[in-house]
């Protein structure tokens, strides 16, 4: 009886679960339909989703005839959603009952939610994606135009957040304009849509780490309405504070004009954008020199004129294909460059640059999960450099530089580049693969120093007409060559767990003028988050290769002894060195046969915390090791006997990759985008050391590169950058950019060629560290005294008297041979700068419909360096200079810029 009762209860319980399910199966229905475009053409592979009120989601993809279906759909109310790239998404409500559901007919329209034609294939945003790192800096067009910048230059903002250590010996970041790599931004400022720094730092698509590159996207035209914009900026000395080294309140004026027009070209399938800007800059440079006649100050006009023109069209050729064509032209004429500080007005030189670029891109999305882009790029760059004076150059260390600049150069470069890249999503994987082929054709003419250069150790040597060196180039100044660069990459970003994502990839770099072809760059990145996604931890590591710069090949081909010869005379006559016979030994330039591409190894660990809807705090540590960095070494420098290994030559400079660097930095960040406030804050604690400053850097001791190991030229322990915009009532905006930095180092040199290698970059030895900083002793062999006797340097060089001194009574010692003071031991000045902008927008007429344009005018007032704090550039590091340890140049003091912008 008991057993029978248990079985009865079991059957009742089971039937209570199975019977409703059986009834539900009997009531389940079929939901089906077709998807087509406005012309009636069926759309294949559209994404279709069916959402239930309970939160469940069913997914389907249309077949070749645009058909979709969902089987086993229970009764209830549902939301049907259809999406396809390039079209506006469609949503419709439907009810499913016991009877058959009517077949759905969905018609897609071309997307007009966005005013630009775009096409892309990607998943919905995931905080774990490699390109969603909160440590990146993303500045859209609205934020860029609101921040206080001189002449609306967007790079003035983004350069604040670039890590110079990520560029190794190439100090400037790489700039990618619409995916094309370059060194400058040659498009109008108003054509910039957005700028990004440090997005997806380990992406194999790029050769540089994230903090060493700037990605710029240009603007496309609107599909719905026409926009016309006109802006004008002016800065005038009458509104500015006087520069610290300007003794006469010199006049100066800068004017900048920009305009743009964009809108639909052919219906809503084609758009255009045309823009340009013009800069008229009459700036000043300030000379602070010590000549034979005494202290000399002068203000020199530095006129500059630039023009940029830009045109772009975007056409939706088919629903799945977009053709984009961009052309830009630029002209830059800049006179009296190089003047200021120790450089007298006659040392000026002028440059004229012309650039043309054409970019054609075809973007296709054959399926919602696949995107392919092909880019054809062609560029023409014409650059000319010429000196104001052709007189021989006179370089007096630590005092003044006069004569001509001895610069005469013409560069013509023609570039052709092909890019192919693809993104493919499959299951838990996101694949990225592609390649770049770039050919560069160069015609290089360099007649620099054909007029000769005299070098003096100090002002006393100049007064006594005793230069220690004279150099002069002779021969054929023209070379032509080509350089081919190839790179290809592959990466897979995969989801290992719901809150764990891994990126692995490989990049391979090849270059035609390098015999080493094993530049393989593996990358790996890992991202993990908490269940709610508000805390993300990222780690990564990778190798990044540099390309050999074309300037290295240019200099090698020109000065290897087959085109030009460089004559070097020690202890020449002055002002005439005399005739230079053909028998004088030359100096040549060679390339290390074992040279290869420099590379950096980067590793990082960081955390990102989302505090509110749009509030993020970040912290990350980055280590970067540079290996095989560029440098130059004189392999024919005198040995201990005073003789050169190859007596038929003076100097044999050799380009090589023997340098190294090491950088560590910790960065704390805060970013918020609230209703009225946008704020970006970055604080960086860093330290960087290396033993080379770049391709042309010569060590003080040519037999000991490691002796140059010291603080990097750009090393700054502390950097704090803040950028923000506060929207005030009545269409007022208040914006700020502030920068606080500790000092960069400066190198302390003796001013003499103490090791007889014809280069006055030798450093002193250390005396008594407690003696006055500007006190030094000099061996008599350098100042017509007794060799081996130490004399007071200031009295001998500045007072004209030889007074013996004890080594314990001076801070520095100038002795024959190599000094023991390290490189970059001087500590430069700190910097503090705050820039503000107050703007007011007046709406003249609001848009009445989606094809109309709001007409408005905006007034802006910018104040740069509102604190009016004197920020020196750096200190003089030449011991033999009367102004050793003092500044001779400063950044601009407080400046005011007034602007007006029309939009209609």
Spans of model-derived segments:
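Periplasm-facing N-terminal accessory domains of Gram-negative outer-membrane beta-barrel systems
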Residues: 21-128, 132
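Transmembrane beta-barrel strands of outer-membrane/channel proteins
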Residues: 121, 230-236, 274-280, 325-329, ...
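Transmembrane beta-barrel wall of Gram-negative outer-membrane proteins
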Residues: 250-333, 350-377, 507, 522
């Amino acid at each position: 009886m008991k057993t029978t009762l248990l079985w009865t209860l079991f059957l009742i319980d089971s039937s209570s679960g199975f019977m409703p399910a059986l009834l539900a199966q009997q009531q389940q229905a079929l939901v089906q339909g077709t998807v087509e475009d406005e012309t009636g053409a069926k759309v294949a592979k559209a994404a279709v989703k069916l959402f239930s009120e309970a939160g469940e989601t069913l997914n389907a993809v249309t077949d070749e005839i645009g058909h979709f279906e969902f089987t086993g759909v229970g009764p209830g109310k549902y939301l049907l959603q259809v999406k396809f790239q390039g079209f506006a998404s469609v949503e419709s409500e439907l009810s499913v009952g016991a009877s058959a559901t009517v077949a759905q007919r969905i018609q897609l329209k071309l997307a007009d939610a966005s005013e630009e034609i775009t096409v892309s294939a990607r998943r919905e945003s995931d905080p774990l994606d490699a390109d969603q790192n909160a440590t990146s800096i993303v500045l859209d067009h609205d934020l860029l135009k609101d921040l206080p910048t001189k002449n609306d230059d967007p790079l003035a903002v983004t350069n604040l957040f670039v890590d110079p250590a990520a560029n190794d010996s190439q100090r400037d970041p790489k700039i990618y304009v619409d995916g094309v790599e370059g060194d400058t931004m040659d498009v109008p400022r108003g054509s910039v849509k957005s700028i990004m720094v440090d997005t997806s730092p380990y992406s194999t698509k790029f050769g540089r780490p994230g903090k060493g590159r700037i990605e710029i996207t240009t603007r496309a035209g609107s599909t719905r309405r026409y926009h016309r914009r006109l802006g004008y900026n002016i800065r005038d000395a009458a509104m500015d504070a006087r520069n610290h080294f300007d003794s006469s309140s010199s006049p100066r004026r800068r004017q900048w004009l920009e305009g743009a027009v964009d809108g639909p070209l052919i219906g809503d399938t084609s758009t255009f954008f045309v823009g340009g800007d013009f800069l008229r800059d009459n700036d000043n440079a300030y000379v602070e020199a010590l000549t034979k006649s005494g202290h000399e100050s002068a203000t020199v006009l530095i006129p500059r004129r630039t023009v940029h023109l830009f045109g772009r069209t975007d056409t939706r050729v088919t629903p799945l294909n977009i053709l984009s064509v961009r052309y830009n032209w630029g002209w830059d004429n800049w006179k009296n460059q190089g003047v200021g500080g120790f450089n007298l007005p006659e040392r000026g030189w002028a440059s004229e640059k012309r650039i043309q670029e054409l970019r054609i891109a075809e973007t296709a999305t054959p399926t919602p999960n696949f995107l392919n882009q092909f880019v054809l790029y062609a560029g023409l760059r014409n650059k000319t450099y010429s000196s104001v004076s052709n007189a021989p150059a006179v370089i007096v260390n630590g005092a003044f530089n006069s004569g001509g600049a001895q610069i005469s150069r013409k560069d013509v470069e023609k570039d052709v580049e092909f890019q192919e890249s693809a993104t493919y999503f499959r299951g838990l994987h996101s694949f990225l693969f592609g390649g770049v082929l770039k050919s560069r054709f160069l015609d290089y003419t360099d007649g620099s120093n054909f007029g000769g250069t005299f070098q003096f150790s100090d002002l006393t040597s100049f007064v006594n007409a005793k230069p220690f060196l004279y150099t002069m180039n002779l021969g054929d100044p023209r070379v032509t060559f080509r350089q081919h660069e190839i790179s290809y990459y592959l990466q897979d970003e995969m989801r290992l767990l719901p809150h764990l994502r891994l990126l692995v990839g490989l990049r391979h770099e090849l270059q035609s003028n390098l015999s080493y072809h094993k530049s393989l760059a593996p990358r790996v990145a890992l991202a993990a988050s908490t269940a709610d996604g508000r805390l993300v931890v990222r780690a990564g590591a990778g190798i990044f290769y540099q390309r050999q710069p074309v300037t290295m090949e240019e200099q090698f081909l020109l000065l290897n002894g087959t085109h030009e010869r460089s004559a070097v005379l020690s202890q020449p006559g002055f002002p005439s060195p005399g005739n230079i016979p053909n028998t004088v030994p030359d100096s040549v330039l060679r390339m290390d046969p074992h040279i290869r591409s420099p590379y950096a190894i980067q590793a990082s660990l960081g955390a990102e915390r989302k505090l509110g809807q749009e509030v993020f705090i970040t912290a990350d540590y980055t280590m970067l090791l540079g290996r095989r960095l560029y440098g130059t070494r004189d392999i024919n420098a005198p040995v201990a006997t005073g003789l050169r290994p190859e007596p038929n030559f003076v100097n044999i400079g050799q380009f090589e990759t023997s340098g190294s660097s090491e950088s560590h930095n910790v960065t704390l960040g805060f970013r918020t985008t609230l209703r009225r406030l946008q704020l970006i804050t970055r604080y960086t604690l860093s330290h960087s050391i290396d033993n080379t400053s770049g391709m042309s850097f010569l060590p003080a001791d040519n037999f000991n590169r490691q002796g140059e190991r010291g603080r990097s030229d750009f090393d700054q322990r502390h950097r704090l950058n803040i950028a923000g915009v506060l929207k005030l009532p009545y269409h007022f905006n208040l914006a700020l950019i502030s920068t606080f930095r500790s000092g960069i180092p400066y190198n302390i040199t003796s001013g003499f060629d103490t090791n007889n290698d014809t280069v006055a970059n030798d450093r002193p030895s250390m005396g008594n560290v407690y003696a006055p900083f500007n006190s030094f002793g000099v061996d008599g062999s350098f100042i017509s005294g007794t060799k081996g006797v130490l004399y007071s340097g200031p009295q001998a060089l500045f007072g004209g008297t030889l007074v013996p001194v004890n080594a314990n009574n001076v801070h520095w010692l100038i002795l024959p041979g190599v000094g023991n003071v390290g490189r970059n031991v001087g500590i430069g000045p700190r910097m503090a700068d705050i820039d503000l902008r107050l703007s007011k927008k007046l709406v003249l007429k609001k848009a009445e419909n989606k094809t109309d344009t709001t007409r408005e005018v905006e007034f802006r007032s910018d104040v740069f360096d509102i604190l009016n704090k004197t920020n020196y550039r750096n200190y003089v590091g030449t011991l033999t200079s009367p102004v050793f340890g003092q500044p001779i140049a400063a950044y601009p003091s407080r400046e005011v810029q007034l602007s007006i912008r029309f939009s209609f």
